[in-house]
Each structure stands twice: as C-alpha cells, then as structure tokens.
Amino acid sequence: MNRSPKPSAPPTLDRIAELGVVGAGGGGFPAAVKLAARVSTVIVNGAECEPLLHKDKELLQHLAEPMLRGLAAAMALTGAREGIIGIKEKYTAVMAGLEPLLPPNVRILPLSDTYPAGDEFLLVHDAVGRIIPPGGLPKDVDAVVANVETLANIGLDRPVTHKYLTVAGAVAAPVTLAAPIGTSIGELIARAGGAAADRIAVLLGGAMMGRLAASLDEPVTKTLGGLIVLPESHPLIERYKATPRQIARIGRSACDQCRFCTDLCPRFLIGHPIQPHLAMQSLGFSTSPTSMAAGTLYCCECNLCSLYSCPENLDPKNVCVASKPAARERKLEWKGTPDSIAAHPLAGDRRVPTKRLIAKLGLAGFRNVGPLEDLGAAPRRVVLPLKQHAGAPAAPVVRPGDRVAAGDLVAAPAAGALGARIHASISGVVRSVDGAVVIEA
C-alpha cells in the first residue's frame, strides 16, 4: 500500500519543503513552515470526524510506521517533548495495533465519537487542556497539530504524488484509495464500483465541510480527504445548492431565535465569542445578505449549526461566512486576553454523536465502511492545479512538450513566498501549464 523503506536520517525542514508536504487534512498549510515553530507538544489529528470517511483510520493501520517516523521528525524539529495521537475511542483495534510501536514520549488520546472532534481547537483542548485564543493558532498554546497523512508523507520521505481519500455514499463498494494527485474524481467513483444512482452529485471533502463538485472531471488535490456521492435529489445536495440571497431571505423571515445553533456551537462551547443566533438575529435589521454580528470572524465553518442544530433547517453557518469580509473591514475583532477564555461548563455534554449526525443528514442508509485498497492502473491523464495549498499558487517549471517522470518537480513557489512544490504523479508528457500542469501518459 504505497510503502517505502525507512529513511536513513530524519528529514530537515528544507527536505520537507522539497517533498511538497502540506496539511493533508484539508488546510493545505506547508508542513515545513508549520514545523518551524518551537512547541512542547505535537498532536496527531486522527479524529476524522466527517461522516462516512475512513482515510485516517485506515492509514493508522496500514502506514503506522511512516506516520510515527514523521511524528518523530516533527517532534525533533519543533523541540517537542511529547507526542499525542488523537483517535476515536471506538477504534480499539487501531489503538491496540499502535500501542506496541509507541516510544515512551508518545501516547494515544481516545476521543469521543462526536462531531467535530477533529477540529484542531477542540483537539488541542482535549489533548493538553488549553484553549487556543480566537483567531489564534495551536502554537499560541505551545502545540502543533498535524494530520495522520501529513506525518506519513514526512515519514515516507519522497515527493508527495498520491493522495489517500475515501469514496463513500451512493457507490457500489465504498473504499479508501491512494490516488495519483490530479486523477479525476469520476475515475475514483468508477473504482468504487460506480455510482448507485442514475443522476448524482458529489461533495468534495465531506458531507459537513465539503463543497459541490462542478463536474466529475475535477481533479484530486493534496487536501482532498473524501468524496461523498449522493443522488442529485438528496436533501443534503439541495442544501448545498442554496444561494447566499436565498439563505439570507429565508433566515430573515423564518428564524425563531431558539439559539440551538449557539448552544451546540463547538467554538462557543470552548469560550470563543461566536454566537450564530446573533448573526441570524441581525439579518432582521438589515437589507444586506450579510450580518454585522461581532464574533462571526471566529466561526470555524463546521456546519453543525446549519445541518444539525437548527430545527428550521436554516443556514447560520453561511450567514456567518458571508459576513466575515465586512467584519474584517470594520475590525470587529476579539479584544480579550487568553486568560479571559473559559470553556462552557456543559461543553462535554453538548457534543453531537456522529451516529445521530449521520441520521440527521440522511446518510444512515449508506454503508459506513472504507477499506484501504490499491487503485489499480494509474490514470492516463492527470491535472495538477497550481493552487492546492495555503499561500500563493506555484509557478510551473516545465513547458508543454516536456517529458516528465513520476516524482519530478513540475511547479514551485516563488522564493520567499508561502506555498508548496508540486510533483508529477505519473510519467508522461506535459500538455499544458495554464493554471494547472496537465500530464498525459
């Protein structure tokens, strides 16, 4: 399953940047930049709280050794004294398999099967008991958080050319695959036995925090963790198709101010100044589709308020998101101090069980499995977007007509710019470099 021999020495920050390693959990932040921090704890995010996705759990079983090598490298680079691996407590076999491999300064943190257990603010609070300040980063509380796959990529010590992801939902055989970056999502659906509905829509990244795919030709990127395939008529797809104006108009007329959206908000429960019900309330006093409620900047966009908490099926999350640019412009920022933040006394009791969330989303009828399997034959064509990471797009270093081998550098960030290198995921000929490097075998 895409294994490699053990590297002779831990990788340096320059080596990690050279390999093109970025946050594989969705953020895409360059790993070499993150690991330049000095902290006491490195936390491995293996919570994987998005419904129906199994990628991280499968990697903890099949790529445990490279992941632990990556963790050791991350701890050495940051000066961390402790490593903590967050895993859902229900995965007892995964934890049992990991335990014998752990060094004395690394421990497993069993996590509740709730959503969003994988939010790094919640994970840090669970792991070390400290609350990241609003707008802050884990390093502000002496920690670094890295995804399982990110650390495995560091431990494998080779250019990042493949992405692990789960294909789930309305497919014949849900599966987790290692796909060459740039593979079309349509090819992955075919590898999962094909769609189990005539007309489908695909959520890229997950049911809660994903986005609708524009077409089945969209490529796999370094940050894509899963595909949720659903019938086009599924209620969840209808929710994702709503326009900002529809969201604001309906929210303005139908919100009953029950404040369930705030009472269950994960960030509110750790003391952050985000109260989605106030954002909804402010819609009633404005003709704009955006809200002026202070605190919307600190919405983590987990979508729990919109897709679970609200009894009226309104969309507080997108109301908060729509207001963020105006809130930044007006500098509606948190003015508190770190020691003024405290978790809600009922925070632990208000966590949402994943099983209940799956039922509310209308996903209970789909198989909740995703075994790791080989993709099979490599695609004949890949599309490598120049922007699949945090920071500026990479600049191509190849031209149409160039022949490349898998692992060759095809794009790189400008000197001094935040970005990541991109490597060929298949061998072939470069056909174009406009916005993406297209390679055909």
Predicted segment positions?
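Short, well-structured beta-strand-loop connectors
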Residues: D263-C265, R399-A412
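Short, Lys/Arg- and Gly-enriched loop/turn segments at beta-strand edges
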Residues: P235-R239, A411-S425
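Ferredoxin-type iron-sulfur electron-transfer modules in oxidoreductases and energy-metabolism complexes
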Residues: L230-R252, F260-D263, R267-A343, P379
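Flanking helices and flexible, charged tails adjoining ferredoxin-like Fe-S electron-transfer domains
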Residues: N2-A9, G20, G25, P51-L53, ...
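Hydrophobic alpha-helical positions that pack around
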Residues: R81-E187, R191-D198, G206-M208
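Histidine-anchored nucleotide/phosphate-binding helix
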Residues: V42, Q61-T78
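Gly-rich Lys/Arg/Thr-decorated short loops/hinges at beta-loop-alpha junctions or inter-strand turns
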Residues: I43-D56, V171
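Short, compositionally biased
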Residues: M209, P244-I250, A417-D434
